[in-house]
From Swiss-Prot:
The keyword Mitochondrion applies. It is found in: Peroxisome; Mitochondrion. Its main location: other. Keywords: Acetylation, Hydroxylation, Mitochondrion, NADP, Oxidoreductase, Peroxisome. One of its GO terms (molecular function) is oxidoreductase activity. The gene is HSDL2. The modification N6-(2-hydroxyisobutyryl)lysine is found at residue 42. This is Hydroxysteroid dehydrogenase-like protein 2. Belongs to the short-chain dehydrogenases/reductases (SDR) family. It comes from Pongo abelii (Sumatran orangutan).
């Protein structure tokens, strides 16, 4: 892990959402240098499901050598933000670093996102980041350190990151767009950057999204804390960057990233919004090494008589196949289904016209997907998003992830018929 240098001693770091998770980890890292930490978060009373309050975080910060100022702050409330900033100035004399970490998430599509949830994400992620930045900037401009760090992703306009959770993506990208604007607006005065993880990070939010067992596919919050610490030590000229945690730590000379893993050696889930997503996943999966090519139809194994929702799903899939679908996909998929009506099924989108069936395909599969029969039917009917199923561990994938993503297009075509 990245060692502390003491360079943040005496600096005041204002962190939203610092009572737990990534925000608290960044706070503790800076506190080890002897920094002053303003814990700007909502949680003043213990939560039945989420550990930590602003006061327990303050105790941890002071235990490692920092000074803490816990402030009850809902970033949707401008008055609470301004009051916390005033308290920070009164107690510590200034603000040197702002970390916009507070965030709200809902991985739902447009029709499944209630207006109330949309407003929450926009007001916490996009508006809250703006309000906190606006309140701190007059004091940051007086600092020799002067950093704003948004925990937000690089701006990636690939539609795949929009189509299943459009509202969340736009809310997070709002945070990222402030980096573009404010980095230019305050160039030479304040360094403004974004930080995003390469892999899933184990937090309470990830536990709720991913369910039991997801932690083994995650890294610890320490990797984000170390990456943030690296950014804080850079000059004001380091601005307008969208930093990935692993990349900046490699620049710092870190080579062993197993120290950040919850379960060293276990395949890690890539995070959203990264261009290298398919490549990063495929490196952790078993690759068949197959090269797509158009083939004449070959004899396929005769399907074993089946009954139920899985067979009906494959019947509808087969009725929808065409040469155009085959040409656009060029892959053989194998489905290992557990539960009632389970077994091994295949979808051949390489042979002319395409084919489906029960058992092993005649050609080696490019992608192997393992899940329950219930989740399989839900995925093809649009009730379970493949990305969410994969991130939560309900869907296991071996092989070419880029080809796995192509299958989503076919699933979307099936939704109206299932």
């Amino acid at each position: 892990m990245l060692p502390n240098t003491g360079r943040l001693a005496g600096c005041t770091v204002f962190i939203t959402g610092a009572s737990r998770g990534i925000g608290k980890a960044i706070a503790l890292k800076a506190a080890k240098d002897g920094a002053n930490i303003v814990i700007a978060a909502k949680t003043a009373q213990p939560h039945p499901k989420l550990l930590g309050t602003i006061y327990t975080a303050a105790e941890e910060i002071e235990a490692v050598g920092g000074k803490a100022l816990p402030c009850i702050v809902d970033v949707r409330d401008e008055q609470q933000i301004n009051a916390a900033v005033e308290k920070a100035i009164k107690q510590f004399g200034g603000i040197d670093i702002l970390v916009n970490n507070a965030s709200a998430i809902s991985l739902t599509n447009t029709l499944d996102t209630p207006t109330k949830r949309l407003d929450l994400m926009m007001n916490v992620n996009t508006r809250g980041t703006y309000l906190a930045s606006k309140a701190c900037i007059p004091y940051l401009k007086k600092s020799k350190v002067a950093h704003i760090l948004n925990i937000s992703p690089p701006l990636n306009l690939n539609p795949i990151w929009f189509k299943q959770h459009c509202a969340y993506t736009i809310a997070k990208y709002g945070m990222s767009m402030y980096v573009l604007g404010m980095a230019e607006e305050f160039k030479g005065e304040i360094a403004v950057n974004a930080l995003w993880p390469k892999t899933a990070i184990h937090t309470a939010a990830m536990d709720m999204l991913g369910g039991p067992g997801i932690e083994s596919q995650c890294r610890k919050v320490d990797i984000i804390a170390d990456a943030a610490y690296s950014i804080f030590q850079k000059p004001k000229s380091f601005t307008g960057n969208f930093v990935i945690d692993e990349s900046i730590l490699k620049e710092e000379g870190i080579e062993n990233f197993d120290v950040y893993a919850i379960k060293p050696g276990h395949p890690l889930q890539p995070d959203f919004f990264l261009d290298e997503y398919p490549e990063a996943v495929s490196k952790k999966m078993e690759s068949t090494g197959a090269v797509p090519e158009f083939k004449e139809e070959k004899p396929q194994p005769q399907p074993k008589p089946r009954s139920g929702a899985v067979e009906e799903t494959f019947r509808i899939v087969k009725d929808s196949l065409s040469d155009d679908v085959v040409k656009a996909t060029q892959a053989v998929y194998l489905f290992e289904l557990s539960g009632e009506d389970g077994g091994t099924w295949f979808l051949d989108l390489k042979s002319k016209g395409g084919n489906v069936g029960y058992g092993e395909p005649s050609d080696q599969a490019d992608v192997v997907m393992s899940m329950t029969t219930d989740d399989f039917v839900k995925m093809f009917s649009g009730k379970l998003k493949p990305t969410m199923a994969f991130m939560s561990g309900k869907l296991k994938i071996k092989g070419n992830m880029a080809l796995a993503i192509k299958l989503e297009k076919l699933m979307n075509q099936m939704n109206a018929r299932l």
